[in-house]
Amino acid sequence: MTAPKPVVLCILDGWGLRAEREANAVALADTPTFDRLMATCPNATLVTHGPDVGLPRGQMGNSEVGHTNIGAGRVVAMDLGAIDLAIEEGSFPQNPALRDFIAKVKANGGTAHLMGVVSDGGVHGHIQHLISAVEVLAGEGIPVVIHAITDGRDVAPTSAGEFVGQLVRVLPEGARIGTVIGRYWAMDRDKRWDRVKRASDAMLHATGEHAPDAEAAVAAALARGETDEFIAPTVVGDYAGARDGDGFFCLNFRADRAREILAGLGQPGFDAYETGTRPDWSAFLGMVDYSKEHDRFMTAAYPKPVIRNTLGEWVASHGLRQFRIAETEKYPHVTFFLNGGREAPETGEDRYMANSPKVATYDLQPEMSAPDVSDHLVEAIGAGYDLIVVNYANPDMVGHTGDLKAAMAAVEEVDRGLGRAVEAVTTAGGAMIVTADHGNCETMVDPETGGPHTAHTTNPVPVILVNGPAGARLHAGRLADLAPTLLQLMQLPQPEEMTGRSLIDA
């Protein structure tokens, strides 16, 4: 029997399953295609959080973690757990890259600028990592300025006051908060350079709103109607900006939302916006590698391990063609993260990235660029590729806004695209796995507070086999099992590095 062609992996980003219908955008939306597939196709559920995806127990998954595990075909130990362990066992203060940073800043008589998300969401960073770094640097007698990035997305929308207060209470002598900035400005990933400029101007040049202290900055923002994610860049107290000889340390460990701000702060020749005169940094450090381009001007405390024989690499090694498609909000996920942290495409790997709409928040345009993604997906299905990976961003990106009606509209748009994909795959004689990388929009109200729920969830996600082998059944598993499943459908052997197991029971 010949292998189906193409084999499609359709990732409905942020589409989780929850039995209760209340505030559940997936259940409340009109989804005839998804409902039909669940009723007629082999299906099961996948775990997307905790140790099953290389995270600490109870820690919700996210798109970086999800796509890394999917592409690797094995459970990948993620940065959060590795850094937590280093702090817990006491090796963090002796990290070689951190020691080098300390030596250079000391030699230049500089201040250490620490930027990181101030929450315990654990998706992009963790407040405890920031606190630990402050303790180490202040303990070395280095003045410390913190650029506190408020979250409100991976945690409750108005919880920044608690986290900033927690940080303030443990600051050692010689450490202070210099700016408070919502992640909307400092953690963009879609080239909205006007936002990034406002964040970097506050850090570099002390321009923006002003507040006497960090807690007052959060309170003033709330009074202006800004929830944590959107707090306008605010200069705290008499902070006057960065100077030559200072060092910069980014505590966030997830690459996609750190790249732009780091480029604006330190990349030589950067010209996406006018930065003004930037300091001659004595040292520029990150928790992890952010990209090969970033490696040219900064070092990493915890370099990424090499993941060999990812799904894309293995398919390419067999001389087969593959196609990756998403809109730009999820560009890194179906490329960089799915390929194990490598930016360059594999041999025979083509890509299409639809431009995400330039709106302030995606509840204003919940369909996002899904119609464009669907058009190019259908075209690719008929173009002779062996493997296609597509990501629909809407359920996650609109779910993050906390707007239930908009999330329902997002889900319905994706369901329309899914319907087109099913028809095209069936016509072509291919097969498709429909799944998600984590949950989000199935929980739009926080059950504890009654307010909007904007974070990911630990709910299971669906996995559906469309137009698969006759008599096939699926069993429950985890994200690492998807690559082996796709390889089985493609009738390719599984590399020994992949320890996941196919979800298909013949």
Swiss-Prot record:
Describe the task this protein carries out. Answer: Catalyzes the interconversion of 2-phosphoglycerate and 3-phosphoglycerate.
InterPro entries of this UniProt entry? Alkaline_phosphatase_core_sf, BPG-indep_PGM_N, Metalloenzyme, PGAM_B_sf, Pgm_bpd_ind
Enzyme Commission numbers on file? 5.4.2.12
Report the GO terms under cellular component: cytosol
Task: List residues binding Mn(2+) 1.
Answer: D396, H400, H456
State a single Pfam family of this protein. iPGM_N
What protein name applies here? 2,3-bisphosphoglycerate-independent phosphoglycerate mutase
**What does the record say about how the cofactor binds?**
Binds 2 manganese ions per subunit.
Q: Where does Mn(2+) 2 bind?
A: D13, S63, D437, H438
Q: Which family does it belong to?
A: Belongs to the BPG-independent phosphoglycerate mutase family.
Q: What gene codes for this chain? A: gpmI
EC class, as a word, reads isomerase
Which organism is this protein's natural source? Cereibacter sphaeroides (strain ATCC 17029 / ATH 2.4.9)
Gene Ontology MF terms in the entry? manganese ion binding; phosphoglycerate mutase activity
Instruction: Write out the catalysed reaction.
Output: (2R)-2-phosphoglycerate = (2R)-3-phosphoglycerate
Q: In which pathway does it act?
A: Carbohydrate degradation; glycolysis; pyruvate from D-glyceraldehyde 3-phosphate: step 3/5
PANTHER family reported for this sequence: 2,3-BISPHOSPHOGLYCERATE-INDEPENDENT PHOSPHOGLYCERATE MUTASE
Q: Report the active site residues.
A: S63
Keywords on this record? Answer: Glycolysis, Isomerase, Manganese, Metal-binding
Q: Which cofactor does it need?
A: Mn(2+)
Quaternary structure?
A: Monomer.
Output one GO BP term: glycolytic process
Annotated positions binding substrate:
H124, R153, D154, R183, R189, R254, A255, D256, R257, K330
